[in-house]
Curated annotation (Swiss-Prot):
Subunit structure: Binds ribosomal protein uS19.
Function: An accessory protein needed during the final step in the assembly of 30S ribosomal subunit, possibly for assembly of the head region. Essential for efficient processing of 16S rRNA. May be needed both before and after RbfA during the maturation of 16S rRNA. It has affinity for free ribosomal 30S subunits but not for 70S ribosomes.
InterPro entries: PRC_barrel-like_sf, PRC_RimM, RimM, RimM_N, RimM_N_sf, Transl_B-barrel_sf
One example of a Gene Ontology biological process annotation: ribosomal small subunit biogenesis
Family stated for the protein in its record: Belongs to the RimM family.
Annotated keywords: Chaperone, Cytoplasm, Ribosome biogenesis, rRNA processing
Intracellular or extracellular location(s): Cytoplasm
GO cellular component terms, A-Z: cytoplasm; ribosome
Protein name, per record: Ribosome maturation factor RimM
Residues annotated as domain PRC barrel: 101-174
Organism: Nocardioides sp. (strain ATCC BAA-499 / JS614)
Chief location category: cytoplasm
Amino acid sequence: METIEVLVGRIGKPHGIRGELTLDVRTDEPERRFAPGAVLRAEPPAGSASRLRRVTVRSARWHQSTLLVAFEEVADRTAAEAARGILLHATVPADAAPDDPDEYYDHQLVGLAAYDVSGAALGSVTGLVHGGAQDLLTVRTPDGRDALVPFVKALVPEVDLAGRRVVIADRPGLVTPLPEDDEH
């Protein structure tokens, strides 16, 4: 069975003195991805002193809407400080999809052609930015510009994985540039 890696979180600041860490969750399935015993690939940021390459979840709990995770390899606050900024990846079957039909893994969206609602080509999806309010699709236009499109139903009404396309309810300034002001 072919597998791929998906980004599931980024380690934040330490919580307490026993090595618990806050987690910037990048998955819609945190209870599954951070279940005790789960093994994740650790990707330290450039310049990090951390030598962690794999971590095993010891425990996970919610505290005031923040996920706190303890890893077998992180025993104390000093080790937790060194782990800050590490990206965590889970291995999933290549054909896996999230349980919710309106949710997608990043790799399912990257490479899709982007069209407006009339069928005109806008470019292609080159990435996603995971933000606080909502995720953003990065759409590379034919002229080489990158546009950030909020990944919400009102602006992205259709995702057709089989057809390898997304439909964007474009408006001036979203993907297409604003019209030139003729008064200058």
